[in-house]
């Protein structure tokens, strides 16, 4: 990058943080936190030498060996792109070949491809001077800010793809700790968020509710706050509103680039049987829509707490796609590249993490859903499978998220195997 542009970016970072200091509410951090130092552009004292994740050796070799079992349509191939421990949500950087990858632990990973080749050249922690808590969600604003969403906080990092090398980075808080949801509602369960910037340039965040079936005494609070739904807000954290409700636990969403509607996956209730309720992929066409939970999930009435005895809300929106029960539909992305054949140019890919609450395991695969001319779902088919050994029920990988790279290849994260895969197409 030309030095003039770097100077311009550095100036922009300083200006952006100055604006954030005015816009964002003050929040008292624990004494042990480094965030206040970083917000003031001060050093934290963290060792700047960040260890890298080995990309060769027995682990990488075994990951490549496992990929030989994955079946794809003719003309496609899958390769190991990077070894990334606990890899979850993927955010493709807007101006470089970098990826930023969230986890459900304490790390956000910076994945660098310095030579623009077929594999990553370096993987290391991003912003290790911060102590992340379940930073599952990562996404980019159109002007180059990296958004990281924890269970109960939202960070913003100006020009993260250019200023990621050291332990200390420029940072702001969109939503301070404890203000995304009420602190007393924090849970270890269903607390991995996902985020997207919408066509309206607002920040959208999923908020899974923590129960298998939420108790009745939580209904009013959750509806008001957006737990068990999707919220949206301005990029500075103001103007928050509940966008969608009746969602049990969505861990994947994307906007259709053609009609701007929001699509999202939803994981449904356990303990009702091997084959019910089915998983959901939904389409939100406007704010304020209700998607059924906890009264009905994938057209199956929920019996716990007597929800099946209640009248079904008249405004309930039915799912666009119903998938195998308990397969755990997670990440999704509309295909916006040009590398794949025309068949894949007007729909989306989604992942299934794989079941646990089922006698015969199912999932651990990628799906492709095509759309009709009116923008609704047409057909859903298996695109990639083989991480689950159907004979033994053993998982060799569990896909989480999917993203489209700049060259049109498809990137897939796997938190079980600790990897990012790359799917490419060459004419058969």
Mark where each language-model region is.
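Hydrophobic core register within WD40 beta-propeller blades
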Residues: 90, 138, 195, 250-253, ...
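Surface loop/turn motifs at the tips and blade-to-blade linkers of beta-strand repeat domains
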Residues: 80-85, 126-131, 175-187, 242-246, ...
């Amino acid at each position: 990058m030309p030095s003039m542009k770097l100077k311009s970016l550095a100036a922009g970072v300083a200006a952006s943080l100055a604006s954030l200091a005015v816009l964002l509410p003050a929040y008292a951090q624990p004494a042990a936190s480094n965030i206040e130092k970083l917000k003031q552009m001060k050093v934290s004292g963290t060792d700047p030498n960040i260890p890298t994740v080995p990309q060769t050796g027995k682990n990488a070799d075994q990951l490549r060996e496992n990929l030989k079992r994955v079946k794809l349509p003719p003309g496609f191939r899958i390769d190991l792109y990077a070894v990334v421990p606990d890899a979850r949500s993927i955010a493709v950087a807007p101006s470089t070949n970098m990826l930023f990858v969230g986890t459900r632990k304490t790390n956000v990973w910076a994945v660098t491809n310095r030579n623009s080749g077929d594999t990553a050249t370096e993987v290391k922690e991003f912003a290790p001077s911060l102590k992340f808590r379940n930073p599952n969600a990562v996404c980019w604003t159109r002007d180059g800010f990296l958004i990281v969403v924890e269970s109960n906080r939202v960070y913003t990092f100006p020009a993260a793809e250019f200023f990621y090398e050291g332990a200390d980075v420029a940072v702001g808080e969109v939503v301070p700790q404890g203000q995304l949801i009420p602190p007393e509602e924090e849970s270890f369960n269903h607390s991995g968020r996902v985020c997207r910037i919408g066509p309206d340039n607002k920040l959208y965040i999923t908020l899974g509710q923590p129960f298998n079936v939420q108790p009745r005494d939580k209904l009013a609070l959750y509806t008001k706050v957006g737990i068990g739904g999707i919220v949206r807000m301005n990029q500075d954290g103001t103007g928050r509103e509940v966008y969608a409700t009746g969602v049990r636990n969505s861990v994947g969403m994307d906007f259709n680039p053609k009609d701007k509607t929001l699509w999202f996956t939803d994981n449904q209730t356990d303990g009702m049987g091997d084959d019910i309720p089915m998983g959901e992929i939904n389409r939100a066409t406007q704010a304020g829509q209700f998607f059924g939970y906890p009264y009905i999930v994938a057209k199956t009435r929920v019996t716990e707490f007597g929800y099946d005895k209640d009248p079904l809300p008249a405004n309930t929106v039915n799912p666009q796609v119903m998938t195998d029960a308990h397969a755990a539909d997670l990440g999704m992305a509309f295909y916006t590249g040009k590398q794949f054949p025309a068949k894949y140019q007007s729909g989306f890919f989604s992942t299934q993490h794989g079941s646990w609450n089922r006698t015969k395991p199912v999932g651990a695969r990628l799906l492709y859903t095509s759309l009709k001319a009116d923008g609704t779902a047409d057909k859903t088919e298996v695109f990639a499978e083989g991480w689950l050994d159907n004979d033994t029920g053993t998982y060799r990988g569990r896909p989480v998220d999917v993203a489209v790279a700049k060259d049109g290849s498809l990137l897939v994260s796997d938190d079980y195997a600790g990897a990012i895969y790359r799917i490419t197409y060459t004419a058969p």
